[in-house]
């Protein structure tokens, strides 16, 4: 599928990957908006009182092999690719946090 179809699938809550990615365990998905308090020592604590709830907007995240999630931005190759796939939902051992080889 192309990126337009992939984006629609992400908005429906699907997890996706590309056949052309070198990291075969990488998946992208929608990270829902959340709120979290400013903590003492946070960079924001210099401008916002500790304990203030800050909103975090929806964004696309990428799930790495070690189980960590990072905000993701599409490259030009990702935007133009036709090899997007919806994750079949299978659980891979390699997705267990801390098991990266």
Predicted regions span which residues?
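Catalytic phosphate/metal-binding cores of nucleic-acid and nucleotide-processing enzymes, i.e., regions
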Residues: 4-25, 29-48
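Short, 15-30-residue, compositionally biased linear elements
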Residues: 1-5, 52-54, 64
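Generic detector of short, locally flexible boundary/turn motifs and exposed helical patches
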Residues: 46-52, 94
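Short acidic, Pro/Gly- and aromatic-enriched capping/linker segments at domain boundaries
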Residues: 1-7, 70-73
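A short, compositionally biased
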Residues: 11-12, 54-58
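A general structural signal for short secondary-structure junctions and capping/turn motifs
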Residues: 7-9, 52, 76-77
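Short, compact, well-ordered microdomains
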Residues: 56-101
